UniProtKB/Swiss-Prot annotation:
SUPFAM superfamilies: Formate dehydrogenase/DMSO reductase, domains 1-3. This is NADH-ubiquinone oxidoreductase 75 kDa subunit, mitochondrial. Its EC number is 7.1.1.2. Belongs to the complex I 75 kDa subunit family. Core subunit of respiratory chain NADH dehydrogenase (Complex I) which is composed of 45 different subunits. This is the largest subunit of complex I and it is a component of the iron-sulfur (IP) fragment of the enzyme. Complex I associates with ubiquinol-cytochrome reductase complex (Complex III) to form supercomplexes. Interacts with MDM2 and AKAP1. The keyword Translocase applies. It comes from Mesocricetus auratus (Golden hamster).
Amino acid sequence: FASEIAGVDDLGTTGRKTESIDVMDAVGSNIVVSTRFAYDGLKRQRLTEPMVRGLLTYTSWEDALSRFEAPLFNARVALIGSPVDLTYRYDHLGDSPKIASQVAALDLGYKPGVEAIRKNPPKLLFLLGADGGCITRSATYVNTEGRVAVTPPGLAREDWKALSEIAGITLPYDTLDQVRDFYMTDSISR
């Protein structure tokens, strides 16, 4: 074992006893590079009782878990999936995979359901292809972490431009930057 790790010669002689970060760190195992596999480290170093950080004194799971969720105070938490009994408040958005694809619409203030539309009827409602691939559109699409997705490749046409051509309406802009400038100027002048 001193000269091989996982069947590869000479790997065992490099980096021995060097502290390392491993995917198993979250379960309380102190794995170092000299450990052969993850289950070797978990065999004797399992977290079985919670401890207070810094003091290294034992505590109850209730106290440990309440400390874990403390950063969630004054945060907006939403859940997509089956409703569960959590110790903090959250908005249940549903458990359908379709709901997950509507995150951006919810970020923009879209209210799901027919009643919300009846109370405040929109002048124009256009969600055509809301589930479509984001690589063919020039807009602000977000992923599950809220980061902006990729821009369209090459000569791909934007949906607003294609829709105006089909409707036979000439618009005073040709690019997304011109659209943003037009609406920013219009909203500032109001």
